[in-house]
């Protein structure tokens, strides 16, 4: 996917069901399991996005896995759900949805977009560098996209962190915000959203 992220698709022996926001447990070593967000809609295949910069057992497994390898996994787990409002029109849906992700935190949102996007959905992503941006490398149809790049300015992006963008543009109190990413960043983003009077649901990794 890029030098820091592996995009892994696993074929299941039979169709499985899960909700956007849930995760799978993957055996990455004989006695070690790691949780990874499910990045695809339910079905016969499972998509995982794995950050390999950590150099841990999960990163080593993701770096070494090859086509045809057998993988032990269990799913689904988790109670953090990203509502898809399936069968609901934009007019009927109670709240606008704004998704915010850093790095592989985009994974559960990809599952949500596969299950059903709405015309008023917004996806805000944050990266240090443009080469870390995953949105141009996924085949999942995305909603309106806002990219925040904190280092060098780039055309078509907001120059700064996601927190800078939210402070500059303001919070929509009529929206529901879904936030996923590293704990510190998610905490800072959630505080801004809550201070703006909006609903926020978040998950960290």
Put a short name on every predicted segment:
Residues 1-74:
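Ferredoxin-reductase
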């Amino acid at each position: 996917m890029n030098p820091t992220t592996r995009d892994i698709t696993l074929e299941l022996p039979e169709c499985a069901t899960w909700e956007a926001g849930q995760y799978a447990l993957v055996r990455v070593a004989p006695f070690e399991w790691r949780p990874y967000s499910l990045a695809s809609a339910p079905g016969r295949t499972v998509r995982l996005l794995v950050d390999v910069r950590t150099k841990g057992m999960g990163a080593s497994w993701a770096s070494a896995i090859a086509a045809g390898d057998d993988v032990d996994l269990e799913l689904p787990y988790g109670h953090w759900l990203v509502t898809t409002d399936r069968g609901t029109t934009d007019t009927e849906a109670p709240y606008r949805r704004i998704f915010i992700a850093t790095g592989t935190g985009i994974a559960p949102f990809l599952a949500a977009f596969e299950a059903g996007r709405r015309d008023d959905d917004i996806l805000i992503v944050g990266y240090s560098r443009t080469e870390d941006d995953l949105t141009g490398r996924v085949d999942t149809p995305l909603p309106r996209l806002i990219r925040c790049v904190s280092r060098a300015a780039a055309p078509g992006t907001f120059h700064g962190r996601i927190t800078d963008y939210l402070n500059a543009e303001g919070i929509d109190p009529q929206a529901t915000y879904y936030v996923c990413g590293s704990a510190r960043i998610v905490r800072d983003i959630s505080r801004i959203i809550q201070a703006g009077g909006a609903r926020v649901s978040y998950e960290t990794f």
